[in-house]
UniProtKB/Swiss-Prot annotation:
InterPro entries: OHCU_decarboxylase, OHCU_decarboxylase-1, OHCU_decarboxylase_sf. Keywords: Decarboxylase, Lyase, Peroxisome, Purine metabolism. Belongs to the OHCU decarboxylase family. Gene3D superfamilies: Oxo-4-hydroxy-4-carboxy-5-ureidoimidazoline decarboxylase. This is 2-oxo-4-hydroxy-4-carboxy-5-ureidoimidazoline decarboxylase. It comes from Xenopus laevis (African clawed frog). A motif (Microbody targeting signal) lies at residues 173-175. It is an enzyme of class 4 (lyase).
């Protein structure tokens, strides 16, 4: 896919193509469509990030709430988005032992109870051990710090998803 193709897309085509660059949050894609044409992939990405940063606190929390629990209910039910399914599988979250599932489930519950949104990490750039370690560590953070960290992870996920769409090739999974 090239930039000319993107810039000539109808609203529906754009939404179909980019609607999940922010997990289950097509509103972001809908909002930036009218900012075409994009001079570069970086500009498209920056428009997404600017939109997210312009949101009030409740909007940013809403974006985080659109993310599924890692190795959670949606994974078990098979209701993850294709992108999340692939990202969680790549991180080894589809192959957890019973003990690992229990530990991750417990940490996910603690995290949601404390912060009011699920733990978000760029699974594609991580693995199950790092994810559990990071989840335990981030439970010690304050609300404002965790909101910033969560949004930073959303941006990493978005970046990799945009790259996948534009480059249509396998990208490095660890930065």
């Amino acid at each position: 896919m090239d930039l000319n193709t993107i810039n000539s897309m109808s609203y529906e085509q754009f939404l179909d193509t980019f609607g999940n660059i922010i997990e289950r949050c097509p509103l972001v894609t809908a909002a930036i469509w009218s900012q075409q044409p994009f001079a570069s992939v970086t500009e498209l990405e920056n428009r997404v990030f600017d939109f997210i940063e312009s949101l009030p606190l409740a909007g940013k929390e809403g974006i985080l709430r659109c993310h599924p629990d890692l190795a959670g209910r949606d994974l078990m039910r098979g209701t993850l988005t294709d992108e999340s399914q692939n990202e969680q599988a790549q991180a080894g979250l589809t192959l957890l032992s019973a003990k690992e599932k229990e530990t991750l489930g417990f940490l996910n519950l603690q995290y949601k109870a404390k912060f009011g949104f699920p733990f978000v990490i760029c699974a594609k750039m991580s693995d199950k051990n790092k994810i559990m370690q990071e989840l335990g560590s981030r439970l010690q953070n304050e609300q404002s710090e965790e909101l910033q960290k969560g949004i930073a992870e959303v941006k990493k996920i978005c970046h990799l998803r945009i790259c996948d769409l534009f480059l249509n090739e396998k990208l490095p999974t660890k930065l």
